[in-house]
Amino acid sequence: MKRLRLIVAAALLALAGPVGAQRPAGVVPAALPLPAPLAATDSGQVFSLTDLLTFVALRHPVARQAGLLPERALQEVRYARGLFDPAATSKYYGKTFGGKDYFHDWDSQLRVPLWFGADLKAGFDRGVGTYVNPESYTAPAGLSYVGLSVPLAQGLLIDERRAAVRQAQALQGLAEAERRGALNKLLLQAAKDYWDWSLNYQRLQLLDRNTGLANTRFEAVRQRVVFGDLAAIDSVEALTELQNRQATLAQARVQFRNSTLLLSNYLWNEQNQPLELPAAARPQVLPGPAAWQPLPPDSVAALAELAQRIHPELQKSRAKLNQLGVERRLLSNKLLPKLSVDYNLLQAGQPFSPESPASLNGNYLQNNYKLGVSFAYPLLLRQERAKLQLNRLKLRETELDLQQDTREIQTGVRTVANEWEALREQLRLQEQVVQNAERLRVGEQIRFENGESSVFLINSRESTLVSARVKLAELQAKYAQTQATLRWAAGGVE
């Protein structure tokens, strides 16, 4: 187990990736108050992924809504425990007609439900009058009693009250799993949108520099055409390339603005008012070669085991099994007959109290009591047996769902881990492609300056280079998203 903890810890450190990296100067702080970074930013200020996830976890409406689930479950437990609240009742019925007192019945009782199924009772009865029911008649001083009502078959081991409490307690685990599941999905999507925003920013920077190079080349070619060093068609070639790059840059600028707006959907203040990400805010850099680390040995198996224990979907299924298990015990108990015994110890006059203790000897107990026994039992039990069978079917369905979900989650962890390793290899190869494209561009530039190349070839080399760099940025963003996805697949992003 200790070795498993070490493996999981190492895996989570590797999964932290760029999220846990040290922030550069000017980074928006994650500490509260959170709205400060969004109130005013200066050029180049970084809004990091940690800042975004902090905003989302604390203030996003979905996160706040998910935070209400445990409180609802707590109130369900309180409601169920209310079934064991003591209850005081008092009833009085009297009749006087024609100046004659027919009867006066007064019944007051305190009933305290006990956890093991019995009810503790204490009360005072007084029934007097000319026509009072003999069953209710007492001496003028009244009759006090203490007693116990105990089920001896159905309701002895479990009853509706205890089942309601147990199911409400299981609901707490279900609510916590639902809260974590909803928050994890929200944080995962926020992380993916953040890296899309970072990718669009990186693409915009690359295309802006590429357009600047095309503009510089166009001006230089135009001057050389004026001086007669190049043919006029070369200036047309340079201008066409510049216009193409300007169109591509405009599209990239729109994509960046749209991704900025999309990211703003996650930003809310303490008053539940939406916030806008300032135009000057910039994302943290995409993960570089230093972050392209392999997963620690045995980490995939450790993460799969971790997911099996803490994944919200599996915890929800286990909580449902607990609830169904409590229901099965209750329904099985319903097959027993209803047999209960009521015993009340009686005393004339005021209720039992330490100031006037009764002499509870054997003779008193034998001559001052009220005893009742009740019995009921359905002959066919069709309803009870059908409900129990339905419960068993639900249990089996939930167990099968748990098995399937466990298999899918473990497969999901391994699938994302495979994508992680594949992306590492793709990143390494793409970095080499960028380096080779840079060498080709530099070589073509030298050939052009020596009069051995053309504007068309220079533009072609630059287009190949910028395409390679954009693809590298896309792989970097996908790598960062895969890190977040692996954390989610293992059971949590928060």
Language model features with spans:
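Small/polar, glycine/serine/threonine/aspartate-rich low-complexity segments that form flexible
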Residues: 34-44, 91-150, 281-296, 328-333, ...
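Bacterial N-terminal signal peptides that target proteins for export
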Residues: 1-8
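Bacterial Sec-pathway N-terminal export signals of envelope proteins
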Residues: 21-103, 148, 152-163, 167-169, ...
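Sec/SRP-type N-terminal targeting helices
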Residues: 64-68, 81, 115-141, 153-178, ...
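A short glycine-centered flexible hinge/capping loop motif at secondary-structure junctions
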Residues: 225-232, 448-452, 489
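Periplasmic alpha-helical coiled-coil/stalk elements that build and connect Gram-negative outer-membrane
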Residues: 23, 176-303, 419, 423, ...
